[in-house]
Amino acid sequence: MPLANTEGGLSISLFRGAKAAAESGGFRTHVLHDRVTRASAFLFDSTADAVAFSRWIEPQVVPMRDWLAGEPIGGLSKHAKLRELETHVVGPTCHVLYAYTTGDAVGMNMITRNSYALNQGFVLENAPVKPKRAVLEGNMGGDKKPSHRYFERGGHGKTVIAECTLTEEAVRRVLKTTLDDLAALAFVGTHGAIASGMQSVAFTPATAIAALFIATGQDVGMVGTSSMAHGTAHKVDGGLHATIRLPGLEVATIGGGTTLPSANAWLSLLDCAGAGRVYRFAQIVAAATLALEISASAAMSTAGSENFYKAHFERGGLR
C-alpha cells in the first residue's frame, strides 16, 4: 500500500489494521453512487422569476444531453455524461446542480467546460425567463469543501463503503485490545462527534486518504471532501463488525497527477492504472481508511489510551 506521509507510525498502524482484517476474513467493499456536480446559479429580479425558471429547466435534462452530444463546440468533453439536474430556489436566485459521471477521471475540468457551454449555449438561449446574471459555480457543488449535503446524500464523488468482521482472536492478538473496549470507544466517539458538530463520525480518515492521494497523484485539494466519513462498530457473535462510509471520494486512475511516473507506478502496483480501474481504486482507498480506523481505535481503546500514547511518544519523536 503506497503511503506518502511524515507521521511516525502511520504506515505500521494501517498495516496492523489490515492484518487484523485479513486474519478475520478480509474486507468487503461496495461502490454505491458515482456523481460529480457543478452547481451554476442564475439571478433574477424576483423570486417568481426564479421559480418560473426552475420549473422550465428541471425537465430539460434529455434536451441538454442531446445538445451536448451534437454540439460542435471545441473543448467539450464527451467523457462527462450529464445524468440529472436539480434546482434550489433561494430568493431571486435559482441554483442548478448539474450531476455528471466522468469515467475514470475526477472530471472537474470536464464538467466545468460542459456546464459553461450549457449555460451559454442552451440555457441563456432558450430560457423563457432571462436571468440578470449567470454564475458557473454558485458554491452548492461541493467542490473542495466538505458540506452536510454531500455527507448525508453523497453525490459529489464516489460513495463507497468498506466493512469487515474482526474475530475476537484477531482483536486480542493483533490489536492488543478487547471487543468490549472497542465497542465502548465507538459509542463514546459517536457521541463526541455529534456533540462537537463534526462533519464526520470517524476517528482519523483524512490521514490514510491524504497519504494515498499524495502517493498516487490524486488532487490533494480534494482530501477534505474525500475524507468525510461515517464509521460504525458493534459487537456480533464472536467478533466486532466495523464499517466506514465515504460519501464523497474523488479519485482518478487517468489524467492529472496520475500520469506522473511515480504515481503511475504505484497505481500499477495496485492494478489500478488506466481506464476501467477507478472503482477498484476507490474500494482500495476505502479499505485502507477502515484499516487505519481499526488500528488507531484499538490503540485509543486500551486502558487510559496507553497504547495510543506510547505509539506517538515512541514513533512521533521528542521535541
Question: Which residues does each predicted region cover?
Answer:
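Structural motif
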Residues: 39-41, 93-95, 132-135, 221, ...
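Extended hydrophobic packing segments that form well-structured cores
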Residues: 274-319
